[in-house]
Amino acid sequence: MHRTLLFLTWLISLTKAFNIKLPHTEKKDHLESNAVLACASYINTLKWSFDSSVVPGFYSTICSYSPAFDTWSLCIFNSLTDQIIPMDNTSFEESLGNVRKTCSFVDKKFSNISLEQYYSSLNNASSHALEDYGSIESLSTSIRVDRETRSRWIRAFHAHAYNLDISSVYGAYLTYYFVIVGIIAVFFHMSHYNGLNRALFASRFVNYIRGHFVLPTFLVDKHANHFKFLNVEVFTGLMPNSLEAWIIFGYTLANIIFLSISYIIDPYNLIFNSHLSQFTRLLADRSGILAFTQFPLIIIFTARNSFLEFLTGVKFNSFISFHKWIGRIMVLNATIHSLSYSLFAIINHAFKISNKQLYWKFGIASITVLCVLLVLSLGIVRKRHYEFFLYTHIILALLFFYCCWQHVKIFNGWKEWIVVSLLIWGLEKLFRIWNILQFRFPKATLINLNTSNNPHDEMFKVIIPKYNRRWHSKPGQYCFIYFLHPLVFWQCHPFTIIDEGEKCVLVIKPKSGLTRFIYNHILQSLNGKLQLRVAIEGPYGPSNLHLDKFDHLLLLSGGTGLPGPLDHAIKLSRNPDKPKSIDLIMAIKNPSFLNGYKSEILELKNSRSHVNVQVYLTQKTAVTKAANARDQLIHFDDIMTELTSFAHIGNARPNFSNVIENAIKSTPPGDSLAVVCCGPPVLVDDVRNTVSQKLLGYPERIIEYFEEYQCW
């Protein structure tokens, strides 16, 4: 935590030292700019005695032909006078900037129009402008535009400019939505410090909400476990839990509302030729801006940010879930933007012309890259080819940001959302590098633990010396580990580790890819031991679960999910006061895995009496089916003999519903119970739903659930 704050302080100081300024989208809906464009557009519709082919450009007549320019300046002045009482000429002088900008598109020399010239044209028009010009076929002198015409055109430009501004505001509101969610999360998280959680979680109403809308899985009984939509393999993914689902629903609803409200339609169709044309343009702008404003949130929720986790208590799993769904809504907004602009171009017979514009080409490139990125982010790709998913995700995201930058380059706005996103992304990468350097690059000892040569028992232990004694990991936290072998040094995997003071310990069951490569390398080494330098990035995850503030603690682990609960049991057993009781339940397929943590498990043997250890062997026949069963039995007997002296041994899968029920019943009214679970996806989903049901069955009991399962 202190390392994160130190790093953030350094970054803020660096930003101030170099006076870094971000791009900023200026407000579009100004009376001055509306008056300039409204008057220019109307005057441009009139016929003037001027050959516009001499000076090409949409506004060439009003910028190059003196009578038209005089008319323009008078129209601007009168439009401002209509709205500003009393008129002090300040707004008129400020409008000169918009005049220069408009005329600079015709010729750069017009960007130097002086204030003296501007007033001279106004005075000339005020003295000589014609009031009645309807019968004149070709104008050669300045005219006075009537008030009704001025007002109609200004309202038309106001409608367009207002939509650009309110779209940015609504986009910011979507960001504030998650700020509010974060503040609420901080409140509940901080309640553990002052004991307020006891009052909150003893409330029947609060537990009713938690049991129905916060803790359970959502719609299906799967959250950690992968879910197949319509039972189709391609649409494999992870469902949010109930709380995440409600937060995502609120965000989606807000996005739909902001897409649907506050449109001003010009009844006279002065800028666009129909109501349909108007609406498609306004919707295109609204959806595109909303898509841009979500870029920073999408990046923030991918960051391995221990600081946000520390403040809110929200897990990285939830951040990733928010990242996915915000990304999907952003893709939806971008798709609406693309389709609406295409329809707008078709309605106005400008599709071929638009296709030649650079901003249009980069818009097509952006949505194409986004669609490819979305397809390559499908759950089946992440699950089966994670490294491919990860690197293509990064490359395509950077390409997408580049295309977006080029897309809005000529529009003088909305670049700040890209810059902020890239800054967050870059600073997060710097923080991660700094984090790795803090641990340095120790030489770890990798030991093969499979003495029976049974494929079921394949595992290896990693013992990592700590060069930096100020580096500490707390129970349940995880680190990303890089094995610095020339062929795989860039790959990393997250593992829960046990910090033993001078060293860190973890046990890995090799699957495929990186862990299989390292395991095979260990097998080829002498005596099944290998020295290999590693890099550690972390620790990440909850650093303050406050389990020491609970009266009773139920630790549930399954399979390779043992390290976190075991570390909690070891550290908390040293506390002479709380918790009053600790139950550690381990469900494993066979005892061989326990040998990897033998010394840590046996530490509980000498701990104070209130640590209750229970081990359940869920596949008793796994040993006897092996070709060298006798050797395995001897190997297993080594750890099992030690365990039987202080732990309960069961030979069947435990009924976790009964285990949790008994823990609640044995907790006296008024005492608090924490249930911590880490294990296979099926287990954690089952325990999550069971705790939710028990909350409804025991609404006045203080029960909290902590899930340490991690998935990406």
From Swiss-Prot:
Q: How is this protein situated with respect to the membrane? A: Multi-pass membrane protein
The residues covered by the Ferric oxidoreductase domain are 287-411
- Residues that hold heme 2 according to the record: H337, H407
Q: Which residues form the FAD-binding FR-type domain?
A: 412-546
Bilayer-spanning residue ranges: 168-188, 245-265, 288-308, 329-349, 361-381, 388-408, 417-437
Where does the UniProt entry place glycosylation sites?
N89, N112, N124
GO BP term, pick one: intracellular iron ion homeostasis
Localization:
Vacuole membrane
Q: Name one GO cellular component term.
A: fungal-type vacuole membrane
Q: What does this protein do?
A: Metalloreductase responsible for reducing vacuolar iron and copper prior to transport into the cytosol. Catalyzes the reduction of Fe(3+) to Fe(2+) and Cu(2+) to Cu(+), respectively, which can then be transported by the respective vacuolar efflux systems to the cytosol.
Official protein name in the record: Ferric reductase transmembrane component 6
The scientific name of the source species is Saccharomyces cerevisiae (strain ATCC 204508 / S288c) (Baker's yeast)
- Give the gene symbol: FRE6
